[in-house]
Amino acid sequence: MNNEVFPNKFKAALAAHQVQIGCWSALANPISTEVLGLAGFDWLVLDGEHAPNDVTTLIPQLMALKGSISAPVVRVPTNEPVIIKRMLDIGFYNFLIPFVETKEQAINAVAATRYPPEGIRGVSVSHRANMFGTVPDYFVQSNKNITILVQIESQLGVDNVDAIAATEGVDGIFVGPSDLAAALGHLGNASHPQVQKAIQHIFARAKANGKPSGILAPVEADARRYLEWGATFVAVGSDLGVFRTGTQRLADSFKK
């Protein structure tokens, strides 16, 4: 059995500022996730915040991605150490932490993924991530192979973006466009000039601090604009969105 899980190639690609094109997985189903894994995306977000996912639904999705080139990234429902620990133990190495507004919150997110003395991650000697105790040097290698992406989606987060981006252990800054738009008074309108200006500012400050930036942009024109603005890791759609629009288009083509 191949029990080599390191190094984390997605983390290395981000550190090298290589463009990484991703997709959102929101259907909470191993078959749809497996299909996404066959498409050739660099990374996939398995959403634990707005999709009906938990440990029991995420494990089969991780299994479905075994052998895929797509790096699984879990968006946890909240920045909470026990939740993060459980995601680590089932086999996630890449984390998207929602609603980070301060440097302290970013520090706490990093600490939750690191074993002592660098952090506070609880220790289990046998779990899915270390292939039930068979991965050589897991405890030595784990801390330096975890990816932490923090999500900026409020005015306070925008105000503190430099301090957040400069936090040791933070690998990238991700913009939550819908929540950011709502926070800026433009609910449902991420295209508003004020929101777009804030997004561009976040990208610029991430770059100034040597960190890659990312965003979810299911509209192709938006995704290409964000890439031109310097975003490195961009999710260009979702399984739910593709399924909904594709089936609607198919039905409409025959019913009109």
From Swiss-Prot:
Active site: 50
Catalyzed reaction equations: 5-dehydro-4-deoxy-D-glucarate = 2-hydroxy-3-oxopropanoate + pyruvate; 2-dehydro-3-deoxy-D-glucarate = 2-hydroxy-3-oxopropanoate + pyruvate
The protein's annotated pathway: Carbohydrate acid metabolism; galactarate degradation; D-glycerate from galactarate: step 2/3
Keyword Thylakoid: no
Cofactor(s) the record lists: Mg(2+)
Enzyme class: lyase
Entries under HAMAP family matching the protein: KDGluc_aldolase
Protein name: 5-keto-4-deoxy-D-glucarate aldolase
Organism: Escherichia fergusonii (strain ATCC 35469 / DSM 13698 / CCUG 18766 / IAM 14443 / JCM 21226 / LMG 7866 / NBRC 102419 / NCTC 12128 / CDC 0568-73)
Higher taxonomy: Bacteria, Pseudomonadati, Pseudomonadota, Gammaproteobacteria, Enterobacterales
